[in-house]
Swiss-Prot record:
The keyword Kinase applies. Pathway: Polyol metabolism; glycerol degradation via glycerol kinase pathway; sn-glycerol 3-phosphate from glycerol: step 1/1. It comes from Chloroflexus aurantiacus (strain ATCC 29366 / DSM 635 / J-10-fl). This is Glycerol kinase. ATP binds at residues 12-14, 266, 310, 314, 411. Sn-glycerol 3-phosphate binds at residues 12, 82-83, 134, 244. InterPro entries: ATPase_NBD (IPR043129), Carb_kinase_FGGY (IPR000577), Carb_kinase_FGGY_CS (IPR018483), FGGY_C (IPR018485), FGGY_N (IPR018484), Glycerol_kin (IPR005999). Belongs to the FGGY kinase family. Key enzyme in the regulation of glycerol uptake and metabolism. Catalyzes the phosphorylation of glycerol to yield sn-glycerol 3-phosphate.
Length: 498
């Protein structure tokens, strides 16, 4: 009797397969990193073939570590780095180009040309997103314009588009031999091509962007049986798809209007459940789909996306060599009482929410001879907390709801120094759940819900529990003084790229 739900979590830097029991506990998992390809400044790519190879490898690894086989798994769900764009040949499965990653800024010129008529918010009323290099539509357009033969093949129906969820679902369900070509509403809502009200591709925007409709996947709910897996998971229903941040919302059981979570990964992403109501943002946030379970109405969210948070710690490690492991940043930061007067604004890929400035680049301000590497480490951690505060302020403005606490997840939530500073700078408690692997858990929940392994959201909510709460310990005057300094530092990043 199958008694576990599996999740494939394909992230920006690594791929994991996690297997959960009915109580939401991790039974076993396997994880493998993949190569980050930087062909030019501002360009970021992944090899789709390597990602599929890693996916098969971690499925094998997780089953082996748990002493399990496909017959023990009720269903598998997929969660993924969103926006990252793959175009491949449907007959062979071969990509026509590397995956263009969400952080990649090569489509800046395409976005500027599209914004010349109607501005950055030209499509926002329909899609909830500003024109930005972050989203998939302009990336597809770049591939069609720059890869010889790609446009003709797309028009002929020979090459197809998908975000990573679509690419993996297609391969999992057979690839060239009958693979299912679908994407869920959460991933589709990040392409800039899906109408948020109809939950279908928008023909007017497709025409303006020059993207043939026949290359796009079918849009489906986040929880339903899409097909049956082949290979390592042969016979297991593929039954859940959620973009990584939406999956974390489901894993955190943020099913009520007004519930919010922040995930700290390569970047950071805060989402606020707005229910079945679309809330347009006037403060630089995104309106996005939170989830859609089966035939139930879609639930929407406001999202604040921050491009660089955890990646800044990696940069300290890999580019500067100031630390040898990410965990060391906390020890360094704790050697000093404050940031020594410096702020580090990591606009490596421009600034995302709430600014949407692709012309911004990273700055360190306030340097004096007094500053040492410990202060730099502290400023790196603080940058994550300040950026989160900016997003929270925007959310409260847009929604009219005052957040009373923030649920957190992701790798950085084990950094106590950061989490305490986060509570201090927000002025609200920060809560880490018992199962911090909420992204994978959310995908497992979506898949398990589709096959009746979990009967409703109440069953999932019963699994959620508090591991640790950080309460604010900073006085209001200090909080606002520090935050003013940050806001000033941010202005120094603008107008850098011509």
């Amino acid at each position: 009797m199958a008694k576990y739900a599996a999740a494939i979590d394909q992230g920006t830097t690594s791929t994991r397969c996690m297997i959960f029991d009915h109580s939401g506990n991790v039974i076993c998992y396997d994880q493998k990193e993949h190569e980050q390809i930087y062909p030019r400044p501002g360009w970021v790519e992944h090899s789709p073939d390597e990602i599929w190879e890693r996916t098969q490898s971690v499925i094998r690894g997780a089953l082996s570590k748990g002493g399990l086989s496909a017959s023990d798994i009720v269903a598998v769900g997929i969660t993924n780095q969103r926006e990252t764009t793959v175009v491949w040949n449907r007959k062979t499965g071969r990509p026509v180009y590397n995956a263009i990653v969400w952080q990649d800024t090569r489509t800046d010129q395409i976005c500027n040309e599209l914004a010349a008529d109607g501005g950055q918010d030209r499509f926002r009323p329909k899609v909830g997103l500003p024109l930005a290099t972050y989203f998939s539509g302009p990336k597809i357009r770049w591939i069609l314009d720059n890869v010889p033969g790609a446009r003709e093949a797309a028009e002929a129906g020979d090459v197809v588009f998908g975000n990573i969820d679509t690419f993996l679902t297609w391969w999992l369900t057979g690839g060239p031999n009958g693979g299912v070509h679908v994407t869920d509403v959460t991933n589709a809502s990040r392409t800039m091509l899906m109408n948020l009200e109809t939950l279908d591709w928008d023909d007017e925007i497709l025409g303006i962007m020059g993207i043939p409709r026949q290359m796009l996947p079918k849009i489906v709910p986040s929880s339903m049986v899409y097909g049956t897996a082949t290979g390592e998971l042969a016979g297991v229903p593929v039954a859940g798809i959620l973009g990584d941040q939406q999956a974390a919302m489901v894993g955190q059981t943020c099913f009520d209007v007004g519930e919010a979570k922040n995930t700290y990964g390569t970047g950071s992403f805060m989402l606020l459940n707005t229910g079945t109501k679309l809330v347009p943002s006037k403060s630089g946030l995104l309106t996005t789909v939170c989830y859609k379970f089966g035939d139930q109405p879609a639930v929407y969210a406001l999202e604040g996306s921050i491009a660089i948070t955890g990646a800044l710690v990696q940069w300290l490690r890999d580019n500067l060599g100031l630390i040898t492991s990410s965990a060391e940043v906390e020890a360094l930061a704790n050697l000093v009482e404050d940031n020594g007067g410096i702020y580090f604004v990591p606009a490596f890929s421009g600034l995302f929410a709430p600014y949407w400035r692709s012309d911004a680049r990273g700055v360190i301000v306030g340097l004096t001879r007094y500053v040492n590497k410990d202060h730099l480490a502290r400023a790196v951690l603080e940058a994550t907390a300040y950026q989160t505060r900016e997003v929270l302020d925007a959310m409260e403005q847009d929604s009219g709801v005052k957040l009373t606490a923030l649920k957190v997840d992701g790798g950085m939530v084990y950094n106590n120094t950061l989490m305490q500073f986060q509570a201090d700078i927000l002025g609200v408690p920060v809560i880490r759940p018992k199962v911090a692997e909420t992204t994978s858990l959310g995908a497992a929940y979506a898949a398990g819900l589709a096959v009746g392994f979990w009967s409703n959201t109440d069953e999932m909510r019963a699994n959620w529990g508090v591991d640790h709460t950080w309460t604010p310990q900073m006085d209001e005057a200090t909080r606002e003084r520090l935050y003013r300094g940050w806001k000033k530092a941010v202005t120094r990043t603008f107008d850098w790229v011509e």
